[in-house]
Amino acid sequence: MVTHNVKINKHVTRRSYSSAKEVLEIPPLTEVQTASYKWFMDKGIKEMFNDIMPIEDFAGKLSLEYVDYSLGEPKYSLKESREQAVNYAAPLHVTLRLTNKETGEIKSQDVYFGEFPLMTEYGSFVINGAERVVVSQLVRSPGIYYNEDTDKTGRVVYGTTVIPNRGAWLELDTDAKGVANIRIDRTRKLPITELIRSFGFGSDSEIQDIFGDEIDSLNLAIEKDVHKDPSMSRVGEALEDIYERLRPGEPKTIDSSRSLLAARFFDPKRYDLGNVGRYKVNKKLSLKSRLLGQTLAEDILNSDGEVVVPKDTKIDKKSMKLISPLLDEEDFHVENLQPDEEGVLPDPIKVQTIKIFSQVDPTKVIKLIGNGHIDESIHHILPADIIAGMNYFFNLQEGVGATDDIDHLGNRRIRSVGELLENQFRIGLTRMERVVRERMSIQDSDTVTPQQLINIRPVVAVVKEFFGSSQLSQFMDQTNPLGELNHKRRLSALGPGGLTRDRAGYEVRDVHYSHYGRIDPIETPEGPNIGLITSLAVYGRINEYGFIETPYRRVDWDTHKVTDKIDYLTADVEDNYTIAQANSPLNDDGSFTNPTVTARHGDNNIETPIEDVDYMDVSPKQVVAVSTAAIPFLENDDSNRALMGANMQRQAVPLVAPHSPIVGTGIEYRAAVDSGLAQIAEEKGTVEYVDGRTIKVREEDGTLHEYPLMKFQRSNGGKNYNQTPIVKVGEKIEKGEVLADGPAMENGELALGQNPVIAFMTWHGYNFEDAIVLNERLVRDDVYTSIHIEEHESEARDTKLGPEEITREIPNVGEDQLKDLDDSGIIRIGAEVEDGDILVGKITPKGVTELSAEERLLHAIFGEKAREVRDTSLRVPHGGGGIIQDVEIFTRENGDELAPGVNMMVRVFIAQKRKIQVGDKMAGRHGNKGTVSVVVPEEDMPFMPDGRPIDILLSPMGVPSRMNIGQILELHLGMAAKKLGIKIMTPVFDGASDDEIIDALKEAGLDEDGKTVLYDGQTGEAFDNRISVGVMHYMKLAHMVDDKIHARSIGPYSLVTQQPLGGKAQFGGQRFGEMEVWALEAYGAAYTLQEILTYKSDDVRGRNKVFESIVKGQAIPKPGVPESFRVLVKELQALGLDMKVLNGKGQEVKMAQMDEDDNVATVDALEQIAKEKPDLFKGDDDDTPRIPATKLDEENV
């Protein structure tokens, strides 16, 4: 096949091996977030206020209505919000109108509704100065669902559930005896007839008239549902029975029963299907979707009485086309069911019916009852829906209709930011509504204004809580641009109203055929969240109902040619069509080359004649998400390893001088640009000025546009976010062109790693078990060097004893420790600091209050005031040393917003330059990960015949069992490309074939097996076998040894157990667990074990004594009782068990609380002794009292 060159942008051209024609641009990748938020701002807010308002008081005198809303200008810009650690938000003002119905007076007023968080251009929010993302949630769609099960006897039983957005669930099923039952809101079962009767159809004959008289499960229910109380009507009795189930034990009347049932289902405030639920219910129950494939038991006539489709016709697509327009007519086959006035709703119930033959018994005539023409604006359920739903349920027993697959994407929908926000806001408004009603009745109706009625606290609190602590509002993953982009496209089945990890079974997590082109089957976390957290496919988009759609090219039904007309289909619509693969061979005119093609229909992959094809995929990468689409030769990798590859690309650390992959897939440019980290030209123009901080562009209309660049900014993950210009002065630029690369980018393309020369061979056992051997050159030339920035904060607060002070005057600190602090005690920018160095000098008062007798005594003894401040300076934590990159100072005088009680805050940023070292984790794009085990001098590395040493050695054992062959193909093609000096684009499922790789190797003058003779760098001799050598894109991951290495000698202890804390963050110890104890027991190392379990852990008295005896050079004393043992005794005593501890002689051991201060004389005792033995405290020259050198003996105390 012929390759062709593709110009990615002005700087990069790649040789493409793709054969499929690109008919559709990849849509904007952050659209999931931005479109949803825009909808919320344009329509969602209005909808919500209109739902809640008008609010009327209990007497109906006052009415508060919503008029309009407006958003003001944000108080802080995006940059300022980050620096000041505040929300990027704008004030929301709502215009409300208050009408006094008695006087006719109208007051309009603008009411402030708090600050509303704004979304940034690329789909994130800035909350408290940190970027956050609201992840879209994948939930079960409201609607009506039918399921099929087999009971113990092997009989097939059907069930129905009506699931609303909010409100009571309604379930239908048949029991072991075949009786049709109903349940409301998970209460006890009732015969199905009770609900039908409650609608106002009391007699058995009325029920059979509606549904037909040959339905076994209904007839059994009628038999079971006997008339118990002849003094009551059947309707009244049914209403009371239902009331009894819903409110057991409460006194019941017909009226209260009727209003309860009406409120449960037919009150829009209590029951809400949402526009999605209404759409799903109408779609499921309308006759249009149910007639296909059935046989008519009556003639279908048009309005003129002509037969359009005769009786006994089996309805196919053609006859459906004839019937379809008739079904849309208001009065076509409509039955008006007139209920008794005792029923819940007295209005006539309109349903649409057609008679057909049963599929089980072709002679039996059954009814299809549709729910009529219910408007989409009606969001609660109606009796017509329930009757049509019951009819569908009965028809299933006749083989008519289909059950639903709950994991099908036609039944699961996405709640994006806009909807999640709307739901939260609505909760706030509902709480506010209660307050407004109460205030309306309390306040004077003549003088009251909208402002006095409204309390915005509940609304503000709810929004704040959502962004701050909801499970779906997450701290943005800012390791690299791909991680950011991916986080915004993530779909989660967890969260409020979703699943929980423990309850989610295998089916929910599994890949479903309806995921094709909608949800990536590969990218998902390993571990407990597998399958629950997924990613939106590249071309997927979310429609107005929240269902994921994917685009297809339409195939003309007459000519069978593929057109460029694109249709977006949801999963349930797609099930009706046959869809050909994107790489089906086509002629230039769009006709298929072969008479048959491989296609999909529902969950079947079929070889089908081209006449049956309805659509064709738009692109081979339609199936996958962005990070999976960045893996070249994905089709040659095992899916488990591809999963790791997709996940690890998000963890690649931005390097100092990254390089885009030599073998790419073509998505690198779009991923980088859409991540929002590159600087993009907003208009066409000419570059006039460039330096590291700004780019100035003269636009065509003569204005000078200045683009500030991001410099050494700390990202959420502590990585260095930096932008580098890639344009020159005088260069002409187009709108949308990349002016400056962001982190992990090169020439506008994603560049997560480097392209080293890699060989698959062993080296003295150093690459055993996925270990990696590195050439020292990679360290020396900063190939894998990255910059990391950590932020440290110190606040000077007001304490009870006086204000804290940031100062250079710190007690007991030598001048050498203060050398880099300025006059105010803050470190200078550019200073090099190590662990434990002072960053901000701070002192806290110990209290200069009225002195107590004891303190006066001590002052008398020591002769001077004890220093009243202690050193609380901010110091560099362990492993945190580096260069001071920036210092930010916030004070009230400068007008900065500080928390209450804080007078000054200092933020210090420390930058570390980390070269690659032993223990760092590295990985390719195919899940081929490993840790660096040794860094070898360049001269000792194996070298090629031209003398060039290999950069990285990987173990050949890592390939066969893992089945990620993509890395080998990438290796060979990369080698050829490097020799030819070109870059390559090989898209997923449409890349270079084996033959094309061999051709490229030949073109580059290399052997076609891609192997080379290598020479041992230590001896200079050739190795026995030729070795695979090539170029592969290899990344350094965020799991660096510097962040993980940790050691402790003395550190903090847990308060209750007195054992050392655990973990690096707490500066904890290493846990010596149960199994480790066994190991020492096995060797009989009794003393080692004893000191580990006592002195080194929680024997409080023992560890203090050990310290003392080491200092004094005495023998180490015997250990005491571990604190955890004392805790156990106390816990048993708390259970009321009298527990005593006896020693070997049978005497009780006193378990008194042994504090560290047990043997330190108290101040009271000192005063006492001073009175009794004043000579003890006399110094050499009588006027300087001193404390004796030895501790006071016990009896003195």
Swiss-Prot record:
It is an enzyme of class 2 (transferase). Its EC number is 2.7.7.6. Gene3D superfamilies: 2.40.50.100, 2.40.50.150, 3.90.1100.10, DNA-directed RNA polymerase, beta subunit, external 1 domain (2.30.150.10), DNA-directed RNA polymerase, subunit 2, domain 6 (2.40.270.10), RNA polymerase alpha subunit dimerisation domain (3.90.1800.10), RNA polymerase Rpb2, domain 2 (3.90.1110.10). One of its GO terms (molecular function) is DNA binding. Keywords: DNA-directed RNA polymerase, Nucleotidyltransferase, Transcription, Transferase. PROSITE patterns: RNA_POL_BETA. GO terms for biological process: DNA-templated transcription. It catalyses: RNA(n) + a ribonucleoside 5'-triphosphate = RNA(n+1) + diphosphate. One of its GO terms (cellular component) is DNA-directed RNA polymerase complex. DNA-dependent RNA polymerase catalyzes the transcription of DNA into RNA using the four ribonucleoside triphosphates as substrates. NCBIfam families: PRK00405.1 (NF001616), rpoB (TIGR02013). Belongs to the RNA polymerase beta chain family. This is DNA-directed RNA polymerase subunit beta. It comes from Oenococcus oeni (strain ATCC BAA-331 / PSU-1). The lineage of its organism: Bacteria, Bacillati, Bacillota, Bacilli, Lactobacillales. The gene is rpoB.
